[in-house]
């Protein structure tokens, strides 16, 4: 059926900020969908609150609204734009839930707006646990015994009836939010209560656990003519019981017999047809490893995380196809863009193995609960492609950018047998390394299977790699063993370690004997049809399919997996760099390892290499492509860390030189530059021993800021107020080495700001200065920021501009850089310089209209700022005021302290823009789900040193009609200052009392918690427990008084003044 001509304007709802469970994959799918709809001639209106995405670029849709994803906000835009239809199935769970909420308000019926793609009834049938169960039973498809409940008591009664373990699955949530496995009555009571609170319809499915079954996923497509097809079948390495987002995944399935595959394929097709889904959907199934029994777990009636993985694994662009199906086209009339000759109804065939491994945030949160279950904890993922499962898995491990570069972990090696068995029975994020260690210690396949329930085939893959380690170690410099090792994915670094050599020696031996990788094409059809996709992976098997073209080429290194501190913002910069290179006539080549992102869409660059971002893999691509040079400024710390090694091997680093990159990052050299330019910076000392750190702190006087050098995202950075705290910090970060000294700085309390600057060596352009709303001490990635600045005088802005220009020229910056300042008493202090793109590039690019990554790329390639039409100094400020607010995923990470400090904790961001600061703040808070009633109850739990500062804030809350709750000390102080305060008892006082803090939170009496008890970082301390309870109960929580002040500004703007005349 040809595309529809009765609709002209389509609204696409985005997925909002990045949180655990909903990451960059929706930027990828949303971008694809918008472009596909525009290609077909429709006007596209996009609504999304996340400025860090390619999707919210003005080139992606005809109209782009970066506004809060609330019913009020989206309804206002609908009334402004009058779209004919809305496409909600590409914005993840947020987009789906928004469509349902809009339908309930009646606005869609009132304005005759149609929902494209999957119909509302189908969405409800798939997402509503009870309706879905009824459908499966009607179709004769098996589901585990279960019951839908709306109250905790019903959950407990059902648990007693069918026995434990039991799985709780809240309705209309994603990433396993609020769910979990319960082994007893108490766990079920707690998890069911939490799940009911987090489900937008207050409903949970309580089902008998089938943990231990194989977990299989099918990505399925269907059109309005009932053509349906399987895009991809994926098999989880981990059995049922671990969320698929936290599981290692292989495609195609590795252990299914043809009979099992066909049986599960038929079930998936039957389900998508019965649900009448139009577009893409994800079916999750559980298969008994010992029989042909299976159960249906769930269906996601939308494009999902797995769809992005399936798209990259097969080359089949699911979101693009789903968008075309939504406008009425059918699979037999849509061309497959990979081959250009076959149609979209042909099922992809793979002649390689894909392995996905999740990337977890526990390097940032060492105290978090790392045990994996049905609630997702990973922030991102990597994907690798090889000819064998071993090769794909090894390459994926190398892509993770963690301490382990292969299957050997020093921590696992030191563990006792008991500890290893514990880790296998209760799997954590690092289980793969403990599996390998178990085989090193002689555990049999049967032993390990008994402990883990992981399929024998996957265990054998791990065991084979451990056996290969021994063979490599026993045969140094043996060419046959080297060939075999490379075939199974062993890196030069690992081989060098086993041979007690340097990686360069292994590389030289390889190259001298012609042992070099070939590059194979990902073509969706296992080479059955002619294909010209510029999408490649390396392997040591067969002939090379990637040829160097005649054009001049430049390699842009991506930023790898999404993690806290290095998010989708860096992918945004990578994509824009590619666009600029293409406009300048260069062949733009991307190397990256992240399946969720736009940069790894093969239609974005001229050539895509899906490879680990290691020195070996990047050099191999450089050897083949012989580029003009490599750009490292846009891939965050990942690409910067590769610069020196690439240069050592003769690869030209474009833009700022390696020597100058080092001068910015090396503390002593940087201090010399600051001194020579007569600039201010907080007094600081460097120490390489624990004693040295203690001495430095005494010399400077507390509080001090301590951090390791060469870090991103403030990892292991803390403000320390006393000797005891410093000793605890050193105990927690005991791995300080000579080559990574600790920096100890005098902690300055002032206004912090961020500047991104572009320099060509003569002219320095400052697109804007972003003022932080929180005082210094909160990491810039976790701080709210406003542009243009609201409290800086012209004189201060001039000083910041002047210092930025001096530093850019002194550091010989060529391209982009980021500087962080503290402004105190009119003086400007330099905190740090990052000689690369920062996470603020997308935000600032969107609101200034200056495409910073593109301008910087042109500078890197030799085009001056003057030639591009930019003048020296600070760019003119726009009329609109824009606020960036961080978004956190604490509800997914048990035991992570939510108190904000110098170590970054946010996973995403939103933006609010308006003509006044208060309105921009209101939108930013609304986008970050911090919407408060006009009057309510606020709980104040304040450290003694903040008591004076809280007084004006408390008075303003009282003035707009809020009741104030506080514990004894704070309450007495506020009462003395004429405020009416409701007294609550402390955490460990009368725990049964109704007015105990925790009971007040549990009973839903509190609308906002302000908690500045930053020293209460122990898990049993009052401050920590209150913060955790607020997060569990979904109560907005602020830990910085500046944020409370900003929130008040937005609330005061909404409320009317009620002043007595007398």
From Swiss-Prot:
Region (Allosteric domain): 930-1062
CDD domains: MGS_CPS_II
Residues that hold Mg(2+) 2 according to the record: 298, 300
Binding site for Mg(2+) 3: 820, 832
Any one GO biological process: L-arginine biosynthetic process
Pfam families given in the database record: CPSase_L_D2, CPSase_L_D3, MGS
Chain residue ranges for the region called Oligomerization domain: 402-546
Residues annotated as domain MGS-like: 930-1062
Binding site for Mn(2+) 1: 284, 298
Binding site for Mn(2+) 3: 820, 832
Region (Carbamoyl phosphate synthetic domain), start-end ranges: 547-929
EC number(s) reported in the record: 6.3.4.16, 6.3.5.5
UniProt cofactor(s): Mg(2+); Mn(2+)
Region annotation (Carboxyphosphate synthetic domain) ranges: 1-401
Binding site for Mg(2+) 4: 832, 834
Annotated residues for binding of ATP 1: 129, 169, 175-176, 208, 210, 215, 241-243, 284, 298
Details of cofactor binding: Binds 4 Mg(2+) or Mn(2+) ions per subunit.
Binding site for ATP 2: 707, 746, 748, 752, 777-780, 820, 832
NCBIfam families per the UniProt record, alphabetical: CPSaseII_lrg (TIGR01369), PRK05294.1 (NF003671), PRK12815.1 (NF009455)
Function: Large subunit of the glutamine-dependent carbamoyl phosphate synthetase (CPSase). CPSase catalyzes the formation of carbamoyl phosphate from the ammonia moiety of glutamine, carbonate, and phosphate donated by ATP, constituting the first step of 2 biosynthetic pathways, one leading to arginine and/or urea and the other to pyrimidine nucleotides.
Written domain comment of the UniProt record: The large subunit is composed of 2 ATP-grasp domains that are involved in binding the 2 ATP molecules needed for carbamoyl phosphate synthesis. The N-terminal ATP-grasp domain (referred to as the carboxyphosphate synthetic component) catalyzes the ATP-dependent phosphorylation of hydrogencarbonate to carboxyphosphate and the subsequent nucleophilic attack by ammonia to form a carbamate intermediate.
Quaternary structure and interacting proteins, as annotated: Composed of two chains; the small (or glutamine) chain promotes the hydrolysis of glutamine to ammonia, which is used by the large (or ammonia) chain to synthesize carbamoyl phosphate. Tetramer of heterodimers (alpha,beta)4.
Protein family membership: Belongs to the CarB family.
Protein name (database record): Carbamoyl phosphate synthase large chain
Organism: Lactobacillus delbrueckii subsp. bulgaricus (strain ATCC BAA-365 / Lb-18)
